[in-house]
């Protein structure tokens, strides 16, 4: 790579998008698993105990995965904001150094 062009506004938008996605995914993962299970027990009863046990495990694993995905988006946003702040500071310092010799 010879040249790298950074457009701060694009990175700000990227960070904001990841915040929004992380929030939406996190909200999707806040279902009331206990209420879902209680409702299903009434439907499946004793006959469906094995299915319900498997479903409860699968749902718990799914919700952990959803939480992890939300955390990845939040982390991506935080890393982008931190990198952009560092870039802006370095860019300003470099510009000041150039101006000082002109």
Region spans (language model):
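Amphipathic alpha-helical hairpins/coiled-coils and adjacent low-complexity
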Residues: 1-102
